[in-house]
């Protein structure tokens, strides 16, 4: 049976949520079944996704809102989206509690870090 890998959305705007195709192709190449996880607000739905998947891929994207790791935004910071940040942090905490495998790339590593109480140098 092929593992189901939850790929968390990397980009979001008012009309669409998306994941770069390279992540989907990579999971397929590794004989996994890619399942895209959209931004959801329900804790119950987050728990359902965590139960459904065998592993998770948190991919790259925009900067994390500095307020979420105890700092004020500085001039020159990139674009942030606190709604996406809060969703991904909630999801990461539940994934870690489930002890299922996580691959975190770029922003995904920052989400992992902040979810565990870490900070980021801006």
Which residue ranges define each predicted feature?
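N-terminal beta1-alpha1 cap of cysteine-dependent amidohydrolase-like domains
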Residues: 1-105, 113-115, 121
């Amino acid at each position: 049976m092929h593992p189901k890998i939850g790929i968390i959305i990397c980009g979001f705007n008012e009309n669409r949520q998306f994941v770069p195709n390279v992540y989907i192709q990579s999971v397929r190449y590794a004989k996994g079944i890619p399942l895209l996880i959209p931004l959801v607000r329900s804790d119950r739905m987050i728990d359902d996704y965590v139960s459904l998947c065998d592993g998770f891929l948190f991919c790259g994207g925009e900067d994390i809102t500095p307020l979420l790791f105890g700092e004020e935004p500085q001039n020159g910071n990139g674009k942030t989206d606190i709604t996406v940040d809060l969703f991904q942090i909630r999801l990461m905490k539940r994934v870690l509690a489930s002890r299922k495998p996580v691959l975190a790339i770029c922003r995904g590593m920052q989400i992992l870090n902040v979810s565990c109480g870490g900070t980021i140098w801006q």
